[in-house]
């Protein structure tokens, strides 16, 4: 039954020309042979699940972008060391799902320019970092803070989980000197903008359009400092012109911490095939994320769904500003309900479609995975961190080898992280 479902899925893709036929036929043959061994072991499927679990547990799995850091600061009852009945992440669920390393992308809050807001943003990030650090200090047998790419592998070998930190949005910074302050806090990547233009660069989604015609001079200086220190430059959310400027200026490979492929889902936040080719030339990595709106374009009921989502955003806009913890969760739950009822929610299969598209365009060495859990991330088959093994299962079903899955699940991301550190060492 499982093999029939797998074959049907692939025959559809081959007929529609969605993927390269020769490459897919070879993978299909491998998958049929692999599946025959894997699924022929037992009628109950117990051995099948054990084999997949063994492969999954053998990986070094990295979530390149988790928004769950917001819970450390805003959720009063959040204890990451215990199993919580809200959110998508905690340490017990991290263990259950087999996630080895997580990059907490610290969301700085309201995107408003100005000196006072930068000060507020800095303090908010500082408080979040302190909250995460305190949690790690309270649970040394479970987790450890990681700063260097090699730290993660060491920590996991010792039987614990590795916690890295990044900052989402260039609104966290208004001077080159601040880069060092964030680096000293333990921040190892920074996204240069979010949904509107920052002081550093233009966003892909600012309704006012471009402000800097790409990257500003301050943005260029910040990139140089990030390269010097060994902080990864995250080009998620940036405009196409900003993307090109960053790749031209950066001496180190860059990351796309959470995005997907524009060829499969038309969204300004996704990256085009041309951008993928430039990313390959830079040696960077794109991490395909579990955000339905980036993985799957709305269908026939597009206008109706989009109107409902637009109305919802307007309803919660001021409420979230006043109480991001309470109303942010309410908004995400309501948004997920609208998407689910519309039949537009993406699945693990959609996620892997985007991974395969990257592989087809630029090869298997430039793609990774991120969740954006507690920031809107979560698809059918992978709603929280306990279900990430389903991604491994889907990759196995599609014929990817253990070594290939290792690259996708963290190897490629850590390669870039290591190269960024080497560039800093040479400076």
Per-segment meaning from a language model:
Residues 15-21:
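Short Gly/Ser/Thr- and charged-rich N-terminal loops/segments
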Residues 24-31:
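Sec-dependent signal peptide recognition
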Residues 31-37:
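Bacterial N-terminal signal peptides
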Residues 41-213, 266-427:
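N-terminal hydrophobic targeting/anchoring segments and the immediately downstream early-domain regions
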Residues 61-68, 238, 256-260:
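Histidine-centered catalytic micro-motifs
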Residues 175-179, 239-252:
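Distinct, well-ordered alpha-helical segments
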Residues 214-226, 246-253:
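Alpha-helix-loop-beta-strand connector modules within alpha/beta enzyme cores
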Residues 221-235, 241-242, 275-281:
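Substrate-binding cleft of carbohydrate-active enzyme catalytic domains
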